[in-house]
Amino acid sequence: MKSLKKQRRIQIIALATVALVGSTALIGYAMRDGINYFRSPSQVMETPPEPTETFRIGGLVEEGTLQRGQGEAVRFSVTDGGASVPVTYVGVLPDLFEENQGMVGTGRYVNGVFEASEILAKHDETYMPKEVVDALKEQGVYREGDS
């Protein structure tokens, strides 16, 4: 009788383990396209990612680089004070997007240009994403009073 209970307990534990591993694998598989790693411009220039890799880049829109093209096409450079990466974007920019302001873009780095599929700007006059602040502090550009 005891061995039957013990065997049943082992079966339940084994089934629970298989279910846990299976659900973890399914969650990881489902999220593979939803995870975008953040990189600063310096990191992108040091180790350029593959053209197929989607990631986020953040920093300050470099002064004097914002160029509006035909329609909704925009070109600018994003910098963290240590390096600058050219960015292209086709779409409507956020209202608070301007030079010398923080931004985060999602896209791919192809042939030396970050091709953004999404651009986010700070949402008020004092906010800057934590990743951008950390990257700017690392380069010695960020000061606490900066917005």
UniProtKB/Swiss-Prot annotation:
Sorted alphabetically, the Gene Ontology cellular component annotations on this record are: plasma membrane
One Gene Ontology term from the biological process aspect of the record: cytochrome complex assembly
Pfam families to which the protein is assigned, alphabetical? CcmE
Question: Which keywords has UniProt assigned to this entry?
Answer: Cell inner membrane, Cell membrane, Cytochrome c-type biogenesis, Heme, Iron, Membrane, Metal-binding, Signal-anchor, Transmembrane, Transmembrane helix
The answer to keyword Heme applying to this record is: yes
The lineage's top-level taxon is: Bacteria
The molecular function terms in GO held by this entry are: heme binding; metal ion binding
Q: Does the keyword Transcription regulation apply?
A: no
Segments spanning the bilayer are 10-30
Q: How does it sit in the membrane?
A: Single-pass type II membrane protein
For the Cytoplasmic compartment, the record's topological domain ranges are 1-9
Q: Where does heme bind?
A: 123, 127
Subcellular location, principal = membrane
Q: Where is this protein localized, as stated in its record?
A: Cell inner membrane
Residue ranges annotated as Periplasmic topological domain? 31-147
In terms of PANTHER family, this protein maps to:
CYTOCHROME C-TYPE BIOGENESIS PROTEIN CCME HOMOLOG, MITOCHONDRIAL
What does the similarity note say?
Belongs to the CcmE/CycJ family.
- Purpose: Heme chaperone required for the biogenesis of c-type cytochromes. Transiently binds heme delivered by CcmC and transfers the heme to apo-cytochromes in a process facilitated by CcmF and CcmH.
What is this protein's record name? Cytochrome c-type biogenesis protein CcmE
Q: Which organism is it from?
A: Ruegeria sp. (strain TM1040)
Q: What is the lineage of its organism?
A: Bacteria, Pseudomonadati, Pseudomonadota, Alphaproteobacteria, Rhodobacterales
